């Protein structure tokens, strides 16, 4: 058994103990891809495009209430009359800009990926976090590095 499979099995066990279904499903899919001999073909594609696929799936989920008619222009206008909606709007803008920096950092400094992934694994498995951590984490790291460079 190679190191990648052992590492994935440990992550699966952590996901099981932490009752984190997302982590278990992700690890199971990667193990299946690897064990059926498709790893060399598919894993580089997943590595390269997976974040973009995930962002697309999340975007579809966020837009689904618009498609079902649950949210329309009336609800949008009504929601913007509250302070919390404006805070949510500004938070969405801020997080999107932070994530943009994360994409830049991961593309230009790939060795950061290991630390970011490990941090995400800890948050997902132990604290029931959501696995958007590497992108946001990289974005925050990018912002901090830019501030440090400035001084």
Curated annotation (Swiss-Prot):
The chain crosses the membrane at residues 5-25, 53-73, 86-106, 116-136. It holds the Pfam family DUF441. Keywords: Cell membrane, Membrane, Transmembrane, Transmembrane helix. It is a multi-pass membrane protein. It comes from the Bacteria. GO terms for cellular component: plasma membrane. The keyword Iron-sulfur does not apply. It is found in: Cell membrane. The keyword Transmembrane applies. HAMAP family: UPF0756. Belongs to the UPF0756 family. This is UPF0756 membrane protein GWCH70_2680. It comes from Geobacillus sp. (strain WCH70). The lineage of its organism: Bacteria, Bacillati, Bacillota, Bacilli, Bacillales.
